[in-house]
Every structure is written in C-alpha cells, then in structure tokens.
Amino acid sequence: MQPEVSDQIFYAFLTGGLCASSTSTTVTSSSDPFATVYEDKALASLRNHKEAERKRRARINSHLNKLRKLLSCNSKTDKSTLLAKVVQRVKELKQQTLEITDETIPSETDEISVLNIEDCSRGDDRRIIFKVSFCCEDRPELLKDLMETLKSLQMETLFADMTTVGGRTRNVLVVAADKEHHGVQSVNFLQNALKSLLERSSKSVMVGHGGGGGEERLKRRRALDHIIMV
C-alpha cells in the first residue's frame, strides 16, 4: 500500500527531501538507500501513531458512554457536563458511605436511641414499633441480657443487627409491643432498661480488668449523653 501524499510530504520535510517554492511543492526521492529506509520507518511510525491515537480515542469514548449510562445521561451530553455530574455523584456516594459508617461502626461513647417509628392499627395488627440503637462495651452476656430485658418488657424482636469493633459494640433492633400493654410512653421504659444494661456492661469490663487495664478503656466512656426520644 502506497503511503499517503501528505505523509510523504511531512516526512520528506523532516529528512530534508522537501523542496518548496512559491508556485509548487515537490517530493524528491533520495538515491541513498539508507535515506529510503529511514523514510519508510518514519512513515510506518506515523501510521502506528495514528492507529494508537485512534484506539485511545475509542477507549475514552467507550468509558464516557458507560458513564452516561450509569448517570442516565443522553448520548448528546458533552464531556464537561458529564464529568461535572460524575464528580457530584462521587461526592454523594462518599457522603452516603460516611453516614452508613456512622450508623454501623460503634462509637467511643455509650449511646442510646429509642424511636417510635410506627403505630400499627390495621386489622388485627395492633402493635407499636420501636427502633432501638445503643453502643457500649462488649461483654459475653450482653446479648443474653438484652433478650431477657426485651422479654421482661413483653416486646418482640423483628430485626437485629450487631457490630463489634475493638471491644465496642453497636446494636440496632426493631421491636414490636402490643398496644394492650404499651403506649408511646413505653419509650421511657425501654430507655431506662437499656441504660441499666449499659451500666452493667461498664461494670463488667471494669471488674474483668481488675480496675487496671479496663480503666483506660473506660476513659473513653461518657455519660449517656445521646438519648433520643420521640
């Protein structure tokens, strides 16, 4: 395949074979075989460069099209607008990740949150639904004591999630209570029962460490300063 004339002119110029005048442009062939080999290599290099550039652009366009699909953008969305939307979406995902982390990773302070999230009065379902969340020092009997506490309050566990990191634990539960025995004021009963449970956890840690090593961990503990009631 013969090289394109524009390629010949460009590389002939680089190798000194281009003769230009005000009226015409010609390409001269060198009788030197080494010069001919050099020109062939230069033209081959140019073709390789063009092919590599074509593939690079195709790869970039493919990635941009994938981003358009992910962000539900139409095919005519320009690159600058698309990239701005990508940056905004990444920021939103980062914020969501931080919020999820705050909800699942145990904090350094003892916390209790009791929320009345639903009042079911449809048909035979006459229950009050509470969402319970608390952080405290972990101990072997904690889960058992928690179940006994809920049982004593005549509450049924609908959902439970526990995360333990570095000796601290966060528990999130959704519990249901029968309206015959409970009302909105039951938030106070549940809160006080959990407060007692957390205090037992702290005492257990102190005794378990003989008042020594556990004392350092208890320095992280604060009073129950995050009690939320609705």
From Swiss-Prot:
The keyword Isomerase does not apply. InterPro entries: ACT-like_dom_sf, AIG1-like, bHLH_dom, HLH_DNA-bd_sf. PROSITE patterns: BHLH. Keywords: DNA-binding, Nucleus, Transcription, Transcription regulation. One of its GO terms (molecular function) is DNA binding. Residues 44-93 form the bHLH domain. Coiled coil: none annotated. GO terms for cellular component: nucleus. It comes from the Eukaryota. Pfam families: HLH. This is Putative transcription factor bHLH107. It comes from Arabidopsis thaliana (Mouse-ear cress).
